[in-house]
């Protein structure tokens, strides 16, 4: 097991490579939660995530013979870029195996760091297996994204930076996927301050660490279902499971809806754009029961494409009650659209879109459906709109965020 000086040496090893991301105090989340909240913005790290820390630390510690062989990794995201940049900095050949359908922007970003990219397999597991085959055939050193002590050591340097800036921090919230990030942070933080609490944050649809703890050993989930794709891991690392058992105080799960809302708040209040997995630790702030504590949320990465940003903002607005989308059945006769528009105007609801198709219901003696999207001021405003429609004899059905394009 690592000692404190191991993490200190790792920080020195990384000093010329990484960006020391400064804590950002959040008056917004502090006021909302009753705690003193800080954000550690690893989305501003080189390559856009914390992964460069573990990747560089691992590769830098290889023997000269291992370095001559080159390194190989499998990844569809941040680990690929971390390994590629680390290898480039150290003058080592890097091969990255990515699934065939990895977004082109991620493929090109990895190539720009000088790595050879091979597209293989439909899913990550296929790419992983092919990378292992190439490792055996060509003699490369495989760089695992989380189940590796040197990778864990590199990720733990985040805790040293946090406690250097905020030595009296009470709680650190950490996104939890495979377990590499939380393993390093938990051990390094506890070595510096044994009473600090480390809380992992998993998506509800990929809670592999909680499943392992309940089972008493690592277990593979049958599937994952979450928008936080960076933490959509079916099985945590066996090495990481030991760290979690011994050094992590609690694990919280977050729904996709909670992620959408927190994503919007980060963009709107802090002008911070983060990937969905990175937002987990921010979404978890509301689930902390303690008050008056100094809490640090590790925002683990910011590699997110523009289309996803747009979708997350729209869905976040729906979850926050800033956009209200509903359907209402109208008698199929003239003047109904005018009546609906009049109600919305009286309630100061700004109409974004109306979708009306009188041919949808071929039985002319029945109602037709109107779908309405309006801008609102929150849940109280939505309730007033709903009540007014009800008074006028209309029945409306609220549509959820999954139905927003």
What do these predicted ranges mean?
Residues 1-405:
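PLP-dependent amino-acid enzyme catalytic core
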